Swiss-Prot record:
CC annotations in GO: chloroplast; mitochondrion
PROSITE patterns in the record: PPR
Protein name: Pentatricopeptide repeat-containing protein At1g62930, chloroplastic
Organism: Arabidopsis thaliana (Mouse-ear cress)
Keyword Acetylation applies: no
Superkingdom classification of source: Eukaryota
Record carries keyword Nucleotide-binding: no
Pfam annotation, one family: PPR_1
PPR repeat feature ranges: 79-113, 114-148, 149-183, 184-218, 219-253, 254-288, 289-323, 324-358, 359-393, 394-428, 429-463, 464-498, 499-533, 534-568, 569-603
Location(s), subcellular: Plastid, Chloroplast
NCBIfam families xref list: PPR
Main localisation: plastid
Disulfide-bond pairs as recorded: none
GO biological process, one term: mRNA processing
Amino acid sequence: MTSCVHLGIVASQSKKMSLAKRFAQLRKASPLFSLRGVYFSAASYDYREKLSRNVLLDLKLDDAVDLFGEMVQSRPLPSIVEFNKLLSAIAKMNKFDLVISLGERMQNLRISYDLYSYNILINCFCRRSQLPLALAVLGKMMKLGYEPDIVTLSSLLNGYCHGKRISEAVALVDQMFVMEYQPNTVTFNTLIHGLFLHNKASEAVALIDRMVARGCQPDLFTYGTVVNGLCKRGDIDLALSLLKKMEKGKIEADVVIYTTIIDALCNYKNVNDALNLFTEMDNKGIRPNVVTYNSLIRCLCNYGRWSDASRLLSDMIERKINPNVVTFSALIDAFVKEGKLVEAEKLYDEMIKRSIDPDIFTYSSLINGFCMHDRLDEAKHMFELMISKDCFPNVVTYNTLIKGFCKAKRVEEGMELFREMSQRGLVGNTVTYNTLIQGLFQAGDCDMAQKIFKKMVSDGVPPDIITYSILLDGLCKYGKLEKALVVFEYLQKSKMEPDIYTYNIMIEGMCKAGKVEDGWDLFCSLSLKGVKPNVIIYTTMISGFCRKGLKEEADALFREMKEDGTLPNSGTYNTLIRARLRDGDKAASAELIKEMRSCGFVGDASTISMVINMLHDGRLEKSYLEMLS
């Protein structure tokens, strides 16, 4: 055993003194020990009292170590049964390394193990994912004449299941039958859980019937494990059929099983089925809990059914099922997204009245709401409030507030938040950088936008196609086409595929810079790249031709567009109408206006402004203005 223990097993006692030091201090300072270490003082005979069931349930780790010290110093030594009680109690604290270390000390003191001791150690090694050492202990105990029992094999089974050796776990259960061990419900439950861990759902479900055939009745935990595993995989129909199977087998499903299926139905967007199952469980007298309600409220909120979600909140309060932070946060987020910030604020106030502390999700949702309604000072106040409550913002919270400031043209405050993120040890993500780059371009700070892009790359944050589109759009709009072309060429050579919007940015940039031929070449190359032009990119190219005075090319592309099945939009018609008006072609512009109106579009602000100016100059009749509106 000693050799097994020394194979890399050292008890982790970072906050505790080593056992050797503890024992040394006990000998030196405590009157519990005689000089010879043989006789206990009158106060220490009662270690047996400390090993009573009630005391062990409340035993603290420090006290357990002290108690072990008392026991090994006691004469005569306590029986192995007494030591087993203590080791078992420590194992239940999940302090497996300590159990192994104490077991090693017992061996050094020549305290012989019994089967129960070996089972404790095997379980600890398995729980530490050290199956080879568990098997070594098994080998040693069998050499000493101890036959493994169902507890031994169940521990090993758990070790196999969690050690990515599921086939050996299945083989072990088969071997148990051969060896005439009778696997119990716990054994099967362990294997079922292991099968789900290794994505063997069908085998796990089949094991239920195999259990029954072997005379072992599945219990609530068995079904709960299978239902949970199936729901995580999205096999909800099978989970529902198991629910019916439970009813036939006179096993009453509990709130946990119903909630698991309801949550899965919600996750897979079957909200009405989830509500029906909720009603079914209620009719059967199974009282829903806060988790059940939270699943449904969250799902209803995601569907924009915030009024139904609010009714569920009222229902749970009436039934004295206390909503928690998850409940309120889901509703607050839904109200914010629906633009109902006043209702969201009322819910927040209700949370505070109920002494429910908001979490980062609550604060982030409200901050987003304030930003959406241009209430940036209140958003900043909420941000500062959450920090004062020791609820520290994450990258998403910062991104929300930075976006709000950038949208309001308060980019410097957004930059200040960006710097604050770094000071807090948070690294901005792609969204952070995209927001700042776009905000800086919109604020006219082209140079700083480029610097932030360079910082993004140097910080190892990967730009995405949105980043490149923002960068290219900004460069083109500020007349830096040459730089944009360099970036675009790099993008084309990279593994990242430009999308239709990226191509549109470049074509528009080329056309506005007077390089219509280059824009046309890029447009023509789209089909070779497998990109189908949409109405936006057609309109951009038509606008480029019109700007250059290439009326025939614009008309030809307009016809091609319709033949291609791409319907013109308001922008397409207005672009062509303005071009015809500039050329003085009243008849052609009138025809286009009629066609546009028949498609349900009207003149945009630019077209109407042009017509009004031409009316004042006497170049157009009033009928044109009436036609447009």
